[in-house]
Swiss-Prot record:
Residues 29-38 have a biased composition (Basic and acidic residues). PANTHER family: TYROSINE-PROTEIN KINASE (PTHR24418). It comes from Mus musculus (Mouse). This is Tyrosine-protein kinase HCK. Belongs to the protein kinase superfamily. Tyr protein kinase family. SRC subfamily. The modification Phosphoserine is found at residue 460.
Length: 524
């Protein structure tokens, strides 16, 4: 195994799995499960009390029949894992290990598994997204499990990769099949990514072109490293694989306020402030502090439990809460801040149109997941999208708008209500649905393509309401392609049922520049 990048960007798309599981793509072959809970808080416990994650479905323990899969035999190949990265224990019950170390898994549930080192015989908890089954494809540098074609392109076009950088990934369309993605360059489009379907033989082998067949994917990779043999490029090095974010601490859902050290104020909104903080001296987080009285603790906890269950790599991950007023919401830290601030910054204002389209596609992917889960955001705008160091966009504050009790916000004519982003039926009748989110997404597209300009420039809220009633829609900016503006206009249909689904919007934005081309290269 070659050396992996030591980057540990919390926003890296590869650092987390797709919904509804948590962990990086490396952990997506796991069964659904809970965080390991080793100690329940008791009434007479001294010191800070940590309340376990209420969304956990099971607890680990010696009598837990679900802690390992059926047919579990300790020490069998199924239970031996190899470390993909170094891990230094940050809790007393954790097990430190070096990349390449082998361990036998004793209990598994969710993000933390109990394991024993084969070398030292020590036992402890390990982050499941730092290991892979021994002799599995996940141990190969070039294999990216569960990654989409679009995210494969984002990875391969990221800094640190070169001509011929490649990955093999699961096929999105054919279960049990694979695709090869390769970084290429052509004078017309610049840096691009080409995709090749890897087909299977009845005998169990693999091929891209029937002229060359291989007994394993490893053999296939070695062959195309020697020469391109019909591919766009000879394979050079595996795609850079950033170190995934460590899973959140076990049993830490409702946490004590003193476990957070506030370090830098990042911004202030209508209902509180956002801070960069350190949790328990070892994990950088973002903390949203809610003004006392802005929502009831009971309503917040109920909504937070629901928000916690929405796990997707284009949604900001909710880690923990402080449930006494003032309420604190603890999430993953996103280095570039809000998309609105980023677009107005020097770096953001230089982003080319294809990157702006990519931001839009990422947000639509997260909203398509919210749509699929029958959830509603209610406050979708650039200020509520966060951006990671590697320019991954994630949706924040989903669901919070529903439980805010501030009259200036709940009264739809109030000064704090985001009129310019809100669908007419939500303004007039309080009818919030996924289709009113689609309207807001159209406004968000306009924010993105104008680099953070306020919608309906020069118009007051009452003027916007009157204009919309008379059929007014914002005109197309000069730099906005007709195809993108057409999406906005469809999002702003008067009748909610005539607006497109987020699933459809995502499909259009993902292939915005390649809709007329085959996504996969044809082999002779």
């Amino acid at each position: 195994m070659g050396g992996r990048s030591s980057c540990e960007d919390p926003g890296c798309p590869r650092s987390e799995g797709r919904a509804p599981r948590m962990g990086c793509v490396k952990s997506r072959f796991l069964r659904d499960g809970s965080k390991a809970s080793k100690t329940e808080p008791s009434a007479n416990q001294k010191g800070p009390v940590y309340v376990p994650d209420p969304t956990s479905s099971s607890k680990l323990g010696p009598n837990n029949s679900n802690s390992m899969p059926p047919g579990f035999v300790e020490g069998s190949e199924d239970t031996i894992v190899v470390a993909l990265y170094d891990y230094e224990a940050i809790h007393r019950e954790d097990l430190s290990f070096q990349k390449g170390d082998q361990m036998v898994v004793l209990e598994e549930a969710g993000e933390w598994w109990k394991a024993r080192s084969l070398a030292t015989k020590k036992e402890g908890y390990i982050p499941s997204n730092y290991v892979a089954r021994v002799n599995s494809l996940e141990t190969e540098e070039w294999f990216f499990k569960g990654i989409s074609r679009k995210d494969a392109e984002r990875h391969l076009l990221a800094p640190g990769n070169m001509l011929g950088s490649f990955m093999i990934r699961d096929s999105e369309t054919t279960k049990g099949s694979y695709s090869l993605s390769v970084r290429d360059f052509d004078p017309q489009h610049g840096d691009t990514v080409k995709h090749y379907k890897i087909r299977t033989l009845d005998s169990g082998g693999f091929y891209i072109s029937p002229r060359s067949t291989f007994s394993s994917l490893q053999e296939l990779v070695l062959h195309y490293k020697k020469g391109k043999d019909g591919l766009c490029q000879k394979l050079s090095v595996p795609c850079v694989s950033p170190k995934p974010q460590k899973p959140w601490e076990k049993d830490a859902w409702e946490i004590p306020r003193e476990s957070l050290q506030m370090e830098k104020k990042l911004g202030a909104g209508q209902f509180g402030e956002v801070w960069m903080a350190t949790y328990n001296k070892h994990t950088k987080v973002a903390v949203k502090t809610m003004k006392p009285g802005s929502m009831s603790v009971e309503a917040f906890l109920a909504e937070a439990n629901l928000m916690k269950s929405l796990q997707h790599d284009k949604l900001v991950k909710l880690h923990a809460v402080v449930s006494q007023e003032p309420i604190f919401i603890v999430t993953e830290f996103m280095a570039k801040g809000s998309l609105l601030d980023f677009l107005k910054s020097e770096e953001g204002s230089k982003q080319p149109l294809p990157k702006l389209i990519d931001f839009s596609a990422q947000i639509s992917e997260g909203m398509a997941f919210i749509e699929q889960r029958n959830y509603i955001h209610r406050d979708l705008r650039a200020a509520n999208i966060l951006v990671s160091a590697s320019l991954v966009c994630k949706i924040a504050d989903f669901g919070l708008a529903r439980i805010i009790e501030d009259n200036e916000y709940t009264a739809r004519e109030g000064a704090k209500f985001p009129i310019k982003w809100t669908a007419p039926e939500a303004i007039n009748f309080g009818s919030f649905t996924i289709k009113s989110d689609v309207w807001s997404f159209g406004i968000l597209l306009m924010e993105i393509v104008t680099y953070g300009r306020i919608p309906y420039p020069g118009m007051s809220n009452p003027e916007v309401i009157r204009a919309l009633e008379h059929g007014y829609r914002m005109p197309r900016p000069d730099n906005c392609p007709e195809e993108l503006y057409n999406i906005m206009i469809r999002c702003w249909k008067n009748r909610p049922e005539e607006r497109p689904t987020f699933e459809y919007i995502q499909s259009v934005l993902d292939d915005f520049y390649t809709a007329t081309e085959s996504q996969y290269q044809q082999q002779p």
